[in-house]
Amino acid sequence: CIRDREDTIRIPAEYMKKGQSLDQHIDRLAMTAFEGRFDEQNRFILVTSNHTPLGRGRIIHGDGAIYQRVRFDALLFCMDDYEVVEGAISEVNEFGAFVRIGPMEALLHKSQILDDQVEVNVGAGTISGRNDDKRLGIGTAVRARIVSLSPDTSDPRRSKIGLTCKQPGLGSLEWLSEAGE
């Protein structure tokens, strides 16, 4: 989703050179300040655009930088608990698989893949059922439900997202098309 937002950026003193407009720097500074982070509603900001300064900036005594309110458009990646998502397996390890959903990685624990017990072959990058021919590997497209969501606002790469495929209509997209789902 795209949202109109307002926030404040810090424009360091070295950006205020004679003959240069602050508008030239606002785009780059706003992108650096906001992109690749979670907002206050735990939505991941992918891209910002149309940065417009609002009013005059403020200078804090002893700092020397300008603190400027900026209005901008933000393209957000939103996730909710129990939402059904699609992604591709990016890594297989002894406890399950990591699934790439948008800009984030989520864990699909081996106990949440099939009702059957599974065997993990880390070397081959596969997870397969013991009693059936169902198999997942790196690059396999899956549909899963988010069962736990703990965004880390200080470092989005450390966010914890848990998935399950143990419900009807979930699992490998290949399995689902074979079953007519």
Segment roles from a protein language model:
Residues 3-181:
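Single-stranded RNA-binding regions, centering on S1/OB-family and related RNA-binding modules
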